[in-house]
A protein has these predicted regions:
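Extended, Lys/Arg-enriched charged tracts that mediate electrostatic binding to polyanionic substrates
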Residues: 19-55, 129-131, 135, 139, ...
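Extracellular structured ligand-interaction cores
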Residues: 7, 52-54, 320
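Short Gly/Pro-enriched turn/cap motifs at secondary-structure boundaries
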Residues: 1, 44-48, 273, 312-314
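Single conserved hydrophobic/aromatic residue that forms the stacking wall/gate
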Residues: 1-8
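Domain-scale recognition of functional cores that engage charged ligands
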Residues: 60-61, 73-79, 84-357
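Short acidic, Gly/Ser-rich segments with clustered Asp/Glu that frequently serve as metal-coordination loops
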Residues: 42-65, 69-77, 231
């Protein structure tokens, strides 16, 4: 993993291109049709528009298998690149190094090569984890020479007399990096009937109207990181398409939109296509035994069915390997662990040291 481009090792961008050229495939992602032109335009302009994502793997004596790609609004960067690095520097006396020790430098390098504007608004929800995640990215931006401001929630945003989007200091909002998932904005679009509009229903700027997430992220003049096209590789509907395009790829798991004969024989994981944080996942054995189940807010979504490939249990915890992509390349690795088979938002980040032999 250290020596190759993760985007090249897993043909996920090839699959993304295939989806965006085929209406029948794109329909599988449950994205409102009113956004399809925006999606395709975002993909056409993709060069230097993606900063970072995270791939989640299972790695054991059987080899390496990818579960999914968090291409949009990935997290765990702070824990891997800062907290564990401090531990490695001050609390660890053995050999080896933290494999995410250079993550902040990689992020800064990606920002330097991006097409971001000189001032970046960092948009986050009012969440403790997102607080430090936003601060870590702000440090990378500062290192890359950008000015920035963190916006917690949308309360500070408003319209000026000319109908432009501004922050509490009166600064124009035209470039943002977000911790919000694109799916949150897409859900806002779903709440408005598509038949009522010939264009994306964003507000154009009346001083008495509140600013919604879609009014920021879907404004044509606002450059957004991560870009809209990342909802395609970040949506689990990409996984059956990857398997169809590259069956038996050594890093992929058999995945389908139904429980096919092979999945019935191996057991399978049931996952909502736009689910997050390990929510609403069922693990079913080849004997139809429910091995684990999580709850959440994604129960109404379409599901995919992925070959059962359980995490290894090491010292009482099931351990997952997470690898960060930065500009499409390897940026670092961390481990997540849980006493249950499914890694969730509250699952631990485990210490990791790599020793070269």
């Amino acid at each position: 993993i250290y020596t190759l481009s993760l985007h090249d090792a897993l043909p996920i961008l090839h699959a993304t291109d295939k989806v965006l050229k085929d209406d029948n495939l794109l329909a599988l992602f449950d994205i409102p049709k009113i956004l399809w032109p925006r999606l395709r335009l975002s993909w056409q302009r993709r060069r230097h528009h993606m900063i970072t994502g995270r791939m989640d793997f299972c790695m054991d004596e059987r080899g390496l298998k990818v579960y999914e790609y968090n291409a949009d609004s990935a997290s765990c960067h702070t824990e891997a690149g800062l907290i564990l690095e401090r531990w490695a520097e001050r609390g660890y006396t053995g050999q080896g190094h933290n494999p995410a020790e250079g993550l902040i430098n990689e992020l800064a390098g990606a920002w330097k090569h991006s097409r971001a504007r000189p001032f970046v608004h960092i948009m986050q929800d009012k969440d403790i984890e997102e607080n430090y995640h936003a601060q870590f990215m702000q440090q990378a931006l500062r290192q890359a020479g950008f000015d920035s401001k963190i916006l917690r929630g949308l309360d500070e945003l408003r319209w000026d007399d000319a109908g432009q989007l501004i922050d509490g200091d009166g600064r124009l909002v035209n470039c943002v990096w977000k911790t919000w998932a694109w799916e949150t904005a897409i859900e806002q679009v779903r709440e408005v009937s598509e038949t009522e509009y010939a264009a994306v229903p964003i507000r154009t700027g009346h001083t008495n109207q509140e600013v919604r997430l879609i009014d920021v992220l879907l404004r044509p003049e606002v450059l957004v990181f991560e870009p809209l096209w990342t909802v395609i590789p970040g949506n689990k509907a990409i996984l059956p398409i990857l398997w169809q395009l590259f069956p038996h790829h050594r890093y992929l798991l058999d995945t389908d939109f139904t429980v096919n004969e092979e999945l019935a024989q191996t057991g399978y994981a049931v996952k909502p296509i736009a689910g997050r944080c390990g929510s609403n996942i069922d693990l079913v054995s080849h004997q139809e035994e429910l091995l684990d189940k999580t709850s959440g807010k994604f129960a109404e979504q379409k599901n995919i069915y992925q070959q059962l490939w359980c995490l290894p249990n090491i010292a009482g915890k099931y351990i997952q390997v997470c690898t960060f992509t930065v500009g499409g390349n390897y940026g670092g690795t961390c481990l997540r662990g849980d006493e249950s088979l499914v890694i969730k938002k509250e699952s631990d980040i485990e210490p990791l040291i790599v020793v070269k032999k």
